[in-house]
Each structure stands twice: as C-alpha cells, then as structure tokens.
Curated annotation (Swiss-Prot):
GO cellular component labels: vacuole
TM spans (from-to): none
Name under which the protein is recorded: Protein STRICTOSIDINE SYNTHASE-LIKE 1
Lineage: Eukaryota, Viridiplantae, Streptophyta, Embryophyta, Tracheophyta
Source organism (scientific name): Arabidopsis thaliana
Family: Belongs to the strictosidine synthase family.
Annotated localization: Vacuole
Glycosylated residue positions: N67, N122, N196
Composition bias type Basic and acidic residues, residue spans: 61-73
Region (Disordered): 61-92
Residues of the signal peptide: 1-21
Pfam family, one: Str_synth
Organism superkingdom: Eukaryota
Alphabetized UniProt keyword annotations: Glycoprotein, Signal, Vacuole
Amino acid sequence: MESLLLIAYAFLYLFLLSHEAEYKINADQSENSNVGRFGGNYGRLGRLSGSIHHWTGEYRGLEKRPNHSEDNPPSRGWTGEPGLDPRGEGPYVGVTDGRILKWSGEDLGWIEFAYSSPHRKNCSSHKVEPACGRPLGLSFEKKSGDLYFCDGYLGVMKVGPKGGLAEKVVDEVEGQKVMFANQMDIDEEEDAIYFNDSSDTYHFGDVFYAFLCGEKTGRAIRYDKKTKEAKVIMDRLHFPNGLALSIDGSFVLSCEVPTQLVHRYWAKGPNAGTRDIFAKLPGYADNIRRTETGDFWVALHSKKTPFSRLSMIHPWVGKFFIKTLKMELLVFLFEGGKPHAVAVKLSGKTGEIMEILEDSEGKNMKFISEVQERDGRLWFGSVFLPSVWVLDRQ
C-alpha cells in the first residue's frame, strides 16, 4: 500500500510540475488587458485595491455580544453569505454552530440574531453540527422582512424580522429527504422559493466527498409557499452550489462545481419547463448573486488547477485523495498552493463574462464564497475564514 501511495504522489508531482505554467494567470497585467488564459470574451482584470474594509469575527465588539462566554465563542467559521436586509442593515452571516449573526456597528459589533436548532445551548462543538445546523444561502423577503436560508443539514428554514429560533419550511421533496440544502432565491411575485439540494447522499460536513465522488444526484427545487408543495425542476446535477433567479423571474440559474457549468431552467415564457447551459466558468463556482441591474456575480472557490483536474479525472482518484490527504492539504492543493480570490460578473442577458476581479496573491482577501453588489459596494464572504470584506467601487 505504501509503495502505491508513493507512485501516486510521484505521478501527481510530475503532473503538477509539467502543467504549472499552463494554468497561471498573470497577476501583473494592466487593468485594461484581458485576463490571462481567460482571454477574449472572458472580461478584464479589475484589481482589488486598498479600498477594502475587512471585518472579522476576531474583534470589533464581538465580546459585547449578549450571552457570549469563553465556552461559546462567537466565531467558529462562516458560511460566506453576507446577507443585507430590506432596510439596508447588516450584513448577516451564518456560523458553524448554527447561529446567524448580525453586524450592528462598531459599538456592538456582531450580535446573535437567529439560530437553526432548539438545542442552541449545546451547540459549541463541531461534533454536534448536524444537530445544530449550518446556515447557508441567506435571502430576505422584502415584503415581510422574513429571512429565509438553506441549512446544510436541516433543510430550508425561516426566521422573522426580530430573529430567534428559525422554523423549518421544507426538508423533503417528492418523498426524498433534502440532504444538503445550499443557496436559494425568492420569487416574491410567484410566492415561490428556489433552492439547490447538492447531494442525496452527503450533507455539508462531507462537502468534498459530494463533488469529488462523481455522483450526479444534485437537484434544483421549486417550493410553492401557498400550496406548500415542492418539486424538482432540474435533476442529475453534479454538486450544484450557487443558485439565483433572473431579475424578471423568467429563469433560474444553478452552478455545478466540478463541470464549471451554469445551468439555466426556464420558469416562464415559450421555453418554460426546459433547461440549457447559460455559461461556462473559468473556475469552480461557489455562490451566485443577481445584481440590481440583472447581471450576476459568481464567487469562484478556486481557478482550475492541475490538481483539481487530476482529482476529477475519475471518481476513484478523488476518493483516493480524500482518504489519504488531510482536509487542509486538500484545500491547499485545490487552490493551486496559494489561497486567492476570484469573482466573475456574468451578463444577465447572454451569460458572457463582463468582468473579473482577482486577488491572485490573496493579500486583500482569499477563499471567497460569495459576492453581493448593493449601492455601489461589493460584499464578500468566506466559507473558510471568519471574515467579511466590503469593496467600495465608487
């Protein structure tokens, strides 16, 4: 067995070495040039500059949060979705112990707003995460002020404007349990919710298994709030992650991670009930968010790297790396050995890439999993770091 491992790692080393230059993006290009291998229609490089505010869970008033104690630390990792409520307050973020925190200014910092599980007092350990929940994909309903979110263990949840214990909205679709509810969006005109169920086998705690195992068991789902009926609108998806509704509600986008494809489901119009490919991404997508003008921002977990290509040649290769490598090393190799940040803006009409923002050195931000644009600002979140960044584009 040891000799087999040595041969495999030797092969990996030679593969990475021989392909290293091919997948690099030149970080020294001018702002008016195309982005390396992304080329041509793949937009322009907009560097992330010093006009970035960085808020973390390590300071800025967290010690003033009610009910805070040393046994129940405020920051245990973030979901990467800095949601903003209809009044412009926040951002709101979810953490690994099942809570949703709200930024309440410099004096109060992050305060507890809501939580997924009634077992709140026992949720200070990662070991009980499946029972305590993991808030993902925060979306506010404008007319009610209610916060809807996907929980990576418990399904789709809802909490009122005043916060507190969330209630379950849906955890089963067509007789099958929702295993890994991911990002969601709300169609307020149709009173419907769209969300991804990333896998029928793995939940949030097994995220790497979910997209390296090769199983196409992910689903995009529509839930009718009036009839309380849920139906699958797209199936056989390979780890669908981000999801967003178009500005006119005519279509829904769902991002597959391994294939780098953005699938489109037509909810209205002459093509209603059909699906097609909306875009091909230059990396592995996390969340996708619609802008106020109808375009879309996609956060890329990482660019396509030699290691990621190798690990997805065949499911057994990915499973081999999961079993033999520590999670930290697996993430490091997927990032190409250098944590960085890449955000892509897609045209809401054509799916073409309009703009790319990249911090190739990871100096200002890295490991981003969400980009949300509002009032001339870009909000970034991270699934691996207890951080929220805001970039003032004005």
